[in-house]
């Protein structure tokens, strides 16, 4: 391969056997091994967090694609919606989307969330999420459920996360779920 890259010129490979270059090569090998081990540890942590999330939310399997929705506004005006995507527990920034709110009244977070979800789920060419996460409480959860049902996607798992109280609102449950701040599932949702 290297010979072809060099216009078929002969290539000699040398591996240092002693001295400073040998020490540098050993240091390089050690650093690469440490980076691989660190990356494997991070992957295992994400997998564990996804498994815990599935267990806590009673999902049939760990969610591979989590879509999180948030509504923000500046003093009740200039309302916008945001979509963040996590694939296998990793942020996928190229799939993030920003929605300018067109129809909801300023300050009406429920209507703004409904508009964002309607616009997102009208796009059939986008991949389907394994879990829909909305920022807020019971009201946002109800708004999201209504839109998903109307869009024919009522089968999708949806939860709401009230960040200040660190509580998870689940469909059909009267009381929110409270997890310890160090719980891997909660930490995954809070990203």
Question: Model features per residue range: what roles?
Answer:
Residues 1-191:
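Acidic, glycine-enriched active-site microenvironments
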């Amino acid at each position: 391969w290297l010979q072809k890259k060099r216009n078929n010129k002969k290539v000699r490979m040398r591996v240092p056997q002693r001295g400073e270059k040998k020490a540098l090569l050993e240091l390089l090998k050690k650093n690469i091994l440490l980076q691989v081990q660190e990356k494997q540890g991070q992957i295992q942590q994400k997998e564990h967090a996804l498994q815990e999330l599935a267990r806590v939310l009673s999902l049939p399997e760990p969610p591979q694609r989590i879509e999180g929705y948030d509504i923000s506004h500046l003093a009740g005006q200039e309302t916008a919606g945001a979509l963040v995507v996590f694939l296998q527990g990793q942020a996928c920034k190229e799939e993030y989307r920003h929605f300018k709110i067109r129809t909801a009244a300023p300050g009406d977070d429920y209507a703004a969330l409904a508009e964002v979800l309607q616009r997102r789920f009208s796009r059939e060419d986008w991949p389907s999420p394994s879990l829909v996460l909305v920022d807020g409480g019971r009201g946002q959860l109800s708004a999201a459920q209504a839109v998903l049902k109307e869009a024919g996607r009522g089968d999708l798992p949806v939860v709401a996360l009230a960040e200040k109280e660190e509580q998870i609102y689940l469909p059909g449950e009267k009381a929110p779920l409270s997890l310890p701040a160090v719980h891997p599932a909660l930490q995954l949702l809070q990203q």
